[in-house]
Amino acid sequence: MEHTYQYAWVIPLLPLPVIMSMGFGLFFIPTATKNLRRIWAFPSVLLLSIAMVFSVQLSIQQINGSSIYQYLWSWTVNNDFSLEFGYLIDPLTSIMLILITTVGILVLIYSDGYMSHDEGYLRFFVYISFFNTSMLGLVTSSNLIQIYFFWELVGMCSYLLIGFWFTRPLAASACQKAFVTNRVGDFGLLLGILGFFWITGSLEFRDLFKIANNWIPNNGINSLLTTLCAFLLFLGAVAKSAQFPLHVWLPDAMEGPTPISALIHAATMVAAGIFLLARLLPLFISLPLIMSLISLVGTITLFLGATLALAQRDIKRSLAYSTMSQLGYMMLALGIGSYQAALFHLITHAYSKALLFLGSGSIIHSMEPLVGYSPDKSQNMVLMGGLRKYIPITRSTFLWGTLSLCGIPPLACFWSKDEILSNSWLYSPFFGIIASFTAGLTAFYMFRIYLLTFDGYLRVHFQNYSSTKEGPLYSISLWGKRIPKGVNGDFVLSTTKSGVSFFSQNIPKMQGNTTNRIGCFSTSFGAKKTFAYPHETGNTMLFPLLILLLFTFFIGFIGISFDNGATDNGIAGLTILSKWLTPSINFTQESSNSSINSYEFITNAISSVSLAIFGLFIAYIFYGSAYSFFQNLDLQNSFYKESPKKAFFGKVKKKIYSWSYNRGYIDIFYTRVFTLGIRGLTELTEFFDKGVIDGITNGVGLVSFCIGEEIKYVGGGRISSYLFFFLCYVSIFLFFFLF
């Protein structure tokens, strides 16, 4: 066993050979390398698979041995200072290693099909392989300086991949936005690391945790300075994990290719912030103010993300806000000290969200032959609908992923989210109310995504792309083009003669049933494809979806916990995850009341599932194919018979839509305050520099020139006169200087 741990340092380095080989080939033999570009996917997957096998072996040893291993190399700079670097293998590391490698492998396989047509295929695989290497290095780091080094590499790779299609202005802008926003957090992280080094004289986790255990009883360190440094560390996690108020970069990051969106949201970029807080939780626990701040930021983020996802039309952007909300749940769990629940939700959410993002990529691929390759159209859920007939495999996997994120048992996210809800109610009713209400919102907006995409009719056939006067009832005016007079463009989902609000899916019946227009085709593996209607993607893209579906079904069972009386340090012995995390849980002092009995579990489960089902029902009322039936029965009017109530309900819907679609006006606020404010300050500085500073300099020169021109005639051109005036000036100067 010791022999296995000694070579764990190989795991982050395994993807590097294929990266270097591709770079060598592109530099020296570019033509041959590009012609044979598809073969590079195999070594990328193979090397990461070896890393996965190694990670699984380490995890099994962690479960059996429950030990923490750390290996260090020391580099002595001088007698007073030495730099230590190495790797740390503990339960948290082993969890993250398995998560990164499994999701990374499936994303690589998926990318081979998704990016096969792209000219930047090799560049994409270089970036994504280096992304995996950086994240693996981050989670195995043994000190803060190593974490910061790999932290920056993870950020760099994410910027490269977000702006992968850099010729598109929106992608370039999104890359810049992610960079600038994360600079704020990264600068705070660096200051926090330097502050703790100044306080403790060490960057090693073991030293920081030992000192942290003595802070409260001994009170030997300035608590204000310590709290400030801890806040700066937390600021880095806020930016990286897209927490309020530094969350604005995450939705725009969807401008990158869909596979990288799956990797960022599941196992790398946004997971890095949660990992950092989990790693440093023993440090934060000794600072109650920071713990309260973490839980408060998490609560705000989970609710804000859910509300902003309610009205998004872009399928990837909707999933991005969903990620933001779920990361808020993890942050809340860490803030209330529920270490196991936070990591459990990190695991279950990663596989479910990877399934949803890769499923959305399959949907986008199926829509592109119909609407073109513009993301405004291929990712627009308003143009979709009825896709369950054409891409049934993708539809099934997407449905299960949606139900998992909604918290429907026995799928993965049900177990972890239910644990967070239970712990939040025990910690504070305020947090419990917000978390539970947001769980209902999660079910609503996730099922909304599913219904708009797969339910009803394929609405793209009702759209007018020809820019001619003839066209069906629907037009693309909802995207700000050709908006008819008298129609509120901010609130209309689709412009029809009957007028359809955002909260509806009323599709008028066209002449001739749309099902009669469907050509003969099959969506099974190896099927003949037609471009008249959406078609299922290839096996390379479907295989990862099916594997992730298995994870979504079964990964949640590792955290099922019941208190049967046989516990070890308050941790239920029958729980695989608890046994896995026992050293970390004991170290972070998680209370034993996290274990619950069967009755409490069933009670909590009924409550959370009821909220989820209610959210699903409301979403189906607004967006399901049965909406037309309810509208014909005047069901909604029966609830609001009085016109003032109907008008009030309409105003509320419009306000909610406007808030959600405009991202809570936060981006607008940042643009006006920071972007325009900094631009105005720059213009003011430029005016001061040119008008005042340059004016004084040029004015002094001009005045000197004019005075010189005037007094040069006083001497009459005689040298004796010049000497006389010179001596007079010197005498006057000496007189004032000396007396």
From Swiss-Prot:
Keywords: Chloroplast, Membrane, NAD, NADP, Plastid, Plastoquinone, Quinone, Thylakoid, Translocase, Transmembrane, Transmembrane helix, Transport
Biological process according to GO: ATP synthesis coupled electron transport; electron transport coupled proton transport
Compartments it resides in: Plastid, Chloroplast thylakoid membrane
Record keyword Plastid present: yes
Residues in the signal sequence: none
Membrane topology note: Multi-pass membrane protein
EC number: 7.1.1.-
Keyword Thylakoid attached: yes
EC primary class: translocase
Catalytic reaction equation(s): a plastoquinone + NADH + (n+1) H(+)(in) = a plastoquinol + NAD(+) + n H(+)(out); a plastoquinone + NADPH + (n+1) H(+)(in) = a plastoquinol + NADP(+) + n H(+)(out)
Single GO cellular component term: chloroplast thylakoid membrane
InterPro entries assigned to the protein according to its UniProt record, in alphabetical order: NADH_UbQ_OxRdtase_chlpt_su5_C, NADHpl_OxRdtase_5_subgr, ND/Mrp_TM, NU5C-like, Proton_antipo_N
Pfam families linked: Proton_antipo_C, Proton_antipo_M, Proton_antipo_N
Assembly behavior: NDH is composed of at least 16 different subunits, 5 of which are encoded in the nucleus.
Function: NDH shuttles electrons from NAD(P)H:plastoquinone, via FMN and iron-sulfur (Fe-S) centers, to quinones in the photosynthetic chain and possibly in a chloroplast respiratory chain. The immediate electron acceptor for the enzyme in this species is believed to be plastoquinone. Couples the redox reaction to proton translocation, and thus conserves the redox energy in a proton gradient.
Family from the record: Belongs to the complex I subunit 5 family.
UniProt protein name: NAD(P)H-quinone oxidoreductase subunit 5, chloroplastic
Organism of origin: Agrostis stolonifera (Creeping bentgrass)
The encoding gene: ndhF
